[in-house]
Amino acid sequence: MAQNYGVTAVVLDSTSNYVIIRFSFIKEIKSMRMFLAILACKVSKCLLKLIGRGSSLPGDIALKICPDVLSRVKLPEQVIAVTGSNGKTSTVEMIAQVMRKSGKKVIWNKEGSNQIAGVTAIILSNCTFGGKVKGDVLLLESDERYAKYSFKFFAPTHYIITNLYRDQLTRNGHPEWVYESVKESIRPESQLILNADDPLVSRYGKDRDNVIWFGMDKQDFSTDHATGVYNDGAFCPECKHRMSYDYYHYAHIGSYHCDNCGHKKHDTQYTVTNVDYDSGIVTINGKYKIKLLFKSVYNVYNILACFAACSIVGIDGDVIADELSHYFLKSGRILQFKLGMNKGTFLIAKHENSVASDRVYDYIIRKNQPCSVIIIIDSVSRRYSTGETSWLWDIDYGVLKADCIQHLYLLGRHAKDLETRLSYTDIDIAKVTVNEDIPAALDEIAAKPLGKLYTVTCFSDKEKFLSKVELTQAEEDV
């Protein structure tokens, strides 16, 4: 039975220099433990904000007080979740933008805390003391390994799974192991929104009716053979017999079928029917044209997943297309900078994720303009300490022999490991400079008239570079 409690709530206003104390009488609180968890989350988050920090700590505190708090809160009618090896943050950011522009109040973890503590923090910090989330849509990015914990107590109404790749060997092992972990997060009542072009992801739709599929038709850049150092689509994930492909878009993503068990690419409701990199236009379902502000196949899939999710919840396709055509990602994965007299583009590629790196280098080469490339590998991960660099051998660095790349700068603690990896390619060693001292190397680069620069690194090393450059206004077409 609901009880009434007299409560003194302390609310810290980080925009002022004082503390506001409000005395409230909270009615219809179903659980004092839930209330205390929400209060602790709100107060700790405000304290962290006052000192300029954001973290998942408020969620950790709340879960200590009330471990099942996520099963007690009242969620919005629409709960959209996104997981997968790549594209989570960008897809969530685009969905949030489109939905907000359409008039919906969206609660989402834009700080990127995507494990259960971060998910708990974003939910509780945006709900009443009675446990009602104050939004029309709850939009959650979830780490693929921890989704099973985040969704133990509630089911997303719509669950997008983008892709599954080799990623962070120390933490994730093999993608088939990650597949099993994600599988545990899927609830019967959730509508799945799946990438039909990924043979591993498409397995989640087996024997399920409530599935929406998205994918891409054959394009000019599609190939009849696997690209990259390895092919994780060589064998069927269902029966382990050899897989056949009609075409590949990249890595193991494409149109596939198994002659032994029948596992194949599913028909899609949301389809990229044309990608024109020259004009920078992607066409969905033969009708909706979207301007590509970042001309990468990764971005095409992120846009498609966003389009599918927003369309499913009732937003008009023309509205979605118009908004995506004018929105540039704010997540810090693509930045414009100036280093000395040289202008450049900063690109995030997750360390330990070979597919992400391959796509970034493919983007640089596709631009086909004279440039120099800076690759920084200093700290492999933000989450754990490791010197394990076998993943370097999964990346197709051989493509960097392209004539448009005039010089390569290898920086950071693992620069010599990368130099060894490059020695097994056809790259001219004369255009490679190795320097483990990042600040000193950047000072040297700043003093040279190199022209266009590209810098490729991960979040763990991002600030080591950005602290030495001047950020400039993002260009529409990078």
Each language-model region and where it sits:
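Phosphate-binding loop of NTP-binding sites
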Residues: 9-15, 21-215, 222-235
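Residue-level signal for inorganic ion chemistry
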Residues: 82, 162, 193, 302, ...
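A generic structural signal for short, well-ordered alpha-helical segments in conserved domains
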Residues: 92-96, 307, 419, 466
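Buried hydrophobic packing segments
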Residues: 95, 99, 119-123, 303-313, ...
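Adenine nucleotide phosphate-binding catalytic loops in nucleotide-utilizing enzymes
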Residues: 215-355
